[in-house]
Amino acid sequence: MGGVIHSDDKNLYFSSGNTDKILYQMDLKKDKISKLKLKEINPQQILPYKNKLFVTHCDLTSGMGKAISLLNPQTGESKVYKFKHNVIQCQTKEDYLYILSNDSIYKYKFDGEKMHLEASSKIAIKGFWKNGYISSFFLK
């Protein structure tokens, strides 16, 4: 298992790290694991958003993947958001979604239904090593 883990008061969510379309949900009181089917492959990062979960879809080896699912874990329903850029990592803050791609960072306003691009910026670091890349970020 090489995926990412998220937990709340009742459940632990994790992916296998494989190219499947499955997110696993473990009921912490019953020690029961169930599968939540997704519409996209490569589930990676799992972020809480209100009573739902954002799930990024990216092959971290190639840096390719342009989708994020918004999953309702109670019903199993999900909606896929497709982007013109790769989704390497993302963070949420209030109703904003910040997405790191291969060479840029994007700020989207999420109104519960649609993603609205508010800003984007290319990442250029002087003196950066020749074959290096930005692999993560955090919000304060």
What residue spans do the PLM features occupy?
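Structural motif
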Residues: 20-25, 62-69, 104-109
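Residue position within the beta-strands of beta-propeller blades
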Residues: 14, 55-57, 99
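Blade-level signature of beta-propeller repeat domains, shared across WD40, Kelch, NHL, RCC1
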Residues: 100-140
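Short loop/turn segments that connect beta-strands within the blades of beta-propeller domains
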Residues: 8-9, 16-19, 29, 49, ...
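Surface loops and adjacent helix of pleckstrin homology
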Residues: 4, 17, 58, 102-103, ...
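Short loop/turn segments that connect beta-strands within beta-propeller blades
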Residues: 26-31, 71-76, 109-113
